[in-house]
Amino acid sequence: NIAIIDQARNGTGCAIVHSDDEVGIQHLNQEAAKAMAAGNRAGYDISKAHAMRWITSNPAKAAGILNQTGSIEVGKDADVVLWTGDPFSVYSRAEKVLIDGALAFDMKDPKIQPITDFDLGIIQPQTNRVN
């Protein structure tokens, strides 16, 4: 469905990969990969760069804040994830995460690896089990 919405209005649709689920929100890149693969199988020519917009600039556009965030440009707010490999692969891991320009996670530095429910496993994702 994402690829179909993406191709609406002569390819100017504003497709978004989203999740209301506490687990799914942590895997939007993989959901985008599945949608890209399904779209390509259906005959749409969807590049990885184009599919990346489904989880970056398109949500910002839909929220009316594309002038503030959604892409890496001078003057825009951005949180950035550097991956160990292809961000659409289930085998890639977040190597570094920058939030508001500050290093928030570094897989090679144990001092910058916050404990999260993602690391602990999801039992009841609605509750805070870290503290």
Predicted feature descriptions by range:
Residues 1, 112-113, 130-131:
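Extracytoplasmic and endomembrane cell-envelope/extracellular-matrix remodeling and assembly machinery
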Residues 21-22, 115-121, 126:
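Metal-coordinating catalytic core of metallo-dependent amide/deamination hydrolases
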Residues 1-83, 103:
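His/Asp/Glu-enriched, well-ordered alpha-helical/loop segment
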Residues 87, 99, 122-131:
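C-terminal recognition in membrane/secretory proteostasis and scaffolding
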Residues 61, 73-118:
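C-terminal cap of metal-dependent C-N hydrolases
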Residues 40-44, 105-109, 121-124:
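Glycine-rich loops and low-complexity Gly/Arg-rich segments
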